């Protein structure tokens, strides 16, 4: 069985990485799909986010990383994936993700959404929080993989944002 783990991963956090590791135990293949969203101004290019994920998951053999545009459910269908993985940090995540899951099911009933609860130690993490802490000079080493921390420190030290 294959599972699709979609997201912007801008940046990849240790919460994302925890879900990837756990999914790799549960599924034969974990496809990490990096969303190309033209309506947002990402901190990192899609290609850099893919590089960060590759570096951070290099010890895992069941991982495939790609980018996509458009609807996640259409991406899943095109890859012949039956499951979409979503992480839940809090009840607010569940409400939002449940809406998306129902929408996806209305488009394609063959694709199920699977929810995994985030480890408690990562429940406060979000890409937005990480960027804000980094922007104000805070330590993010316990929030993101080393490659991401290095990239963010470089960006915010140089004032590129």
From Swiss-Prot:
Entry's EC annotation: 2.7.7.3
Catalytic activity: (R)-4'-phosphopantetheine + ATP + H(+) = 3'-dephospho-CoA + diphosphate
Residues that bind substrate: 8, 40, 72, 86
GO biological processes: coenzyme A biosynthetic process
Superkingdom as given in the UniProt entry: Bacteria
UniProt binding sites for ATP: 8-9, 16, 87-89, 97, 122-128
Key word Transferase present: yes
Transmembrane segments: none
Cofactor (UniProt): Mg(2+)
Cellular component, GO annotation: cytoplasm
UniProt keyword Nucleotidyltransferase, yes or no: yes
Primary residence: cytoplasm
Pathway: Cofactor biosynthesis; coenzyme A biosynthesis; CoA from (R)-pantothenate: step 4/5
One function term, GO molecular function aspect: ATP binding
Listed Pfam families: CTP_transf_like (PF01467)
Residues the record marks as site: Transition state stabilizer: 16
Top-level class of the enzyme under EC nomenclature: transferase
Localization of this protein: Cytoplasm
Keyword annotations of the record: ATP-binding, Coenzyme A biosynthesis, Cytoplasm, Magnesium, Nucleotide-binding, Nucleotidyltransferase, Transferase
Subunit structure: Homohexamer.
Family classification: Belongs to the bacterial CoaD family.
Task performed by this protein: Reversibly transfers an adenylyl group from ATP to 4'-phosphopantetheine, yielding dephospho-CoA (dPCoA) and pyrophosphate.
UniProt xrefs under HAMAP family: PPAT_bact
Protein name, as recorded: Phosphopantetheine adenylyltransferase
Organism: Prochlorococcus marinus (strain SARG / CCMP1375 / SS120)
Gene: coaD
């Amino acid at each position: 069985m294959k599972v699709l783990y979609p997201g912007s991963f801008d940046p990849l956090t240790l919460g994302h990485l925890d879900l990837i590791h756990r999914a790799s135990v549960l599924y034969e293949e974990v496809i990490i799909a990096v969303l190309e969203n033209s309506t947002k101004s990402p901190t990192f290019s899609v290609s850099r986010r893919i590089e960060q994920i590759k570096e951070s998951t290099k010890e895992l053999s069941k991982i495939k990383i790609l980018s996509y545009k458009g609807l996640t459910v259409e991406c899943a269908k095109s890859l012949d994936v039956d499951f979409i993985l979503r992480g839940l940090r809090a009840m607010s995540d569940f409400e939002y993700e449940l809406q998306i899951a129902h929408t996806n099911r209305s488009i394609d009933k063959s694709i199920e959404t699977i929810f995994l609860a985030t480890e408690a130690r990562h429940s406060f993490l979000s890409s937005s929080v990480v960027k804000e802490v980094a922007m104000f000079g805070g330590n993010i080493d316990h929030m993101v993989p080393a490659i991401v921390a290095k990239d963010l420190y470089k960006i915010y030290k140089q004032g590129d944002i």
